[in-house]
Amino acid sequence: MPILYEIEYNYMLNSILLLTSFLGTAVPNDADSTVFKTVGLSEVTVVEFKKSKENLATNSVSVVDSGFINRHELQSITELTAVVPNFYMPEYGSKQNTPVYIRGVGAKTKGSAVGFYVDGIPHFENSSFDVDMSNIASVTVFRGPQGTLYGRNAIGGIINVTTVSPLTYQGTQFKLGYGSHNDALFQFSHYNKLGSKMGYSVAGGYHYNDGFHRNMFTNKYADQLKDAYGRVALVWLLDNKWFLRVNSMLDYSNQGGYPYGKYNRLTGETEPVNYNRYSSYRRLLSTSGVNIRYAGENISFSSQTAFQYIRDRQGIDQDFTSNDTYFVKNRLKQTMLSQEFILKSNNSSRYQWLWGAFAMSQHINNTVETQYITKDNAFPTHYRIPVNALAIYHQSTIKLFSGFSFIAGLRWDYENSTLKYLRETYQLSTDGARTEVKNVNSSLHFNQITPKFALQYQDECNNNSYYFSVTRGYKAGGFNQTFQKEEETSFGPEYNWNYELGGKVHLLKDKLYAEAALYYIDWRQQQVNQTVPGVGNVIHNAGHSSSKGFELALNSSPLKNLSIALSYGYTYAKFIEYQKSAKLNYSGNMLPMVPRNTLSCSASYALYPSSTSFIDKIVLTAGLTGLGKIYWAEDNEVAQNFYALLNAKISITSGIFTWECWGKNITDTHYNTYSFKSSADYAQIGKPAYFGTSLLVKF
């Protein structure tokens, strides 16, 4: 075992042994047992069918609450991988690359196939997904198409992040942390009420890390991280029927990135990072939103207005070698304004309905410059891509008889986008005059209707439910921001039919909750990403694909103050028909970037020492997540076999102070988190074992 890791192991072990000398007899706290009955089982579970927009969905919906997030030290949304079954959000490259895959449905670049919302504000670009997880009340993951319930259609599902409300929690918190690789963290939050019906919150933080991957050429870490954020919110209950929420977030990241080393297919070994130019990514992300709601006796209304601004800059040594061959600069500015209206029934009648309308205007200005150092020339390419979208959706639920209900929904989508493309060239050494190489002006229009049908049975006596649903998914096409051939300028829409059979049951007097689902996805014209050396990512449409599998989630509280969660997902996703070219036929191959298995096991136990101890509470948490097998490209020539990561945390509370110690990938499992083929095979090694400690002050 490396010396550094051995010291850190001994440090945590000695801390735990020292702790036991201060413990009295562990006496369960009856007040806390109530919390476990009402909250513990819902940490990673499926939302029940209640009269809310979210719970009208007749498919798998998993919720991760703030307790689970804090006990497992989840600092990024990517750490929900495998915690939610068949959910995969790989962490590689930089924050610019944050793809999401649910049941094999996803997109590596150019617009996610999974919708992402933070307090009702949509995030449409992958580069805006990786945000800080502090002060999060819950993360809800909807698996399967959600077009009849959410604004912009998401062919794979929805991630809905909700922050803490100052009307439900008041207090001030400071957190100071330090860990391996010089990881430093500072966070603060303040929640307060101005009277009985108005509240405000202010939160912020800073995170620094030296990095995990050393560049052998520069002898410096390639993936240093500096991140700062701030959030403000105002919540106002105008009266018993009207509600107003105004919130804004600003996030700035400056990081080294793309720590890729050469990968040897024969030995399965990945070499250290070794390229001559520093690669980096900087992102400024700003989001603001206004939500107005009305809840009457028979109807409810919601209006969500949102604005998002992204400005980022990428620099990448795209030959990934010590040779000074070529370097790529990528600068992007995006603005997005969206409006969503929802009107739905709000009573207990046999017929429930929901109507929604969504409009969006997005403007992207992007400049990608490829510098060919050895040839002493550069090719800057300028893109202007405005996108306008409009959608109207409806869902009806009819209660039939004896607990049976029939659900039908319909969605209409319209989207148009235009491309203004200008490619130039100039001499690098002189930074001379630009010469036009290519000029393209083009436009695209998409129009689509997608239905949904479902039958559900609700056993109200035991609070169990069962369902079967058939849903059509759709994702519009668009323009490639890099291309070599005329036919690569744009790509078409993709479609799927999602068939699902599932059930959700409470057992053993509500001490065990179980959820299971079987699904089959028939996928047409899948949007597939191809990495072109020196050019970037190009999207094209495959012919016919399928994804089938099942999911199982168990949550139990067998003893007071003990909660156990288990989730497993299996996905078998392959190309049924994919003739890429005259010579390349990938029909029958597995889809890339899709784990065959996802596994998560976790347990948390709270102890309450006797009144003679100065310690109020101790929480012990351990979790294991597993993934694999994952193919990295359509040719299925390189893959990552199944691997598992073990994490643990202990927190000790005394009065207003809480001390935490945690470790991630404790067994120092070696695995690749991403791989691709360029001039050679390259891969990024996953994070090694690392540890940390933090002090929280709450008052």
Task: Enumerate the language-model features and the residues they cover.
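Conserved C-terminal beta-signal and adjacent last beta-strands/turns
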Residues: 332, 336-348, 352-356, 396, ...
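Structural signature of Gram-negative outer-membrane beta-barrels, strongest in the C-terminal barrel
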Residues: 234-239, 249, 343-346, 350-352, ...
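Short, acidic, small-residue-rich periplasmic hinge/interaction motif at the N-terminus
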Residues: 28-70
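Short acidic/polar hinge/loop motifs at secondary-structure boundaries
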Residues: 119-145
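Membrane-embedded beta-barrel scaffold of Gram-negative outer-membrane proteins
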Residues: 291-318, 458-475, 490-548, 557, ...
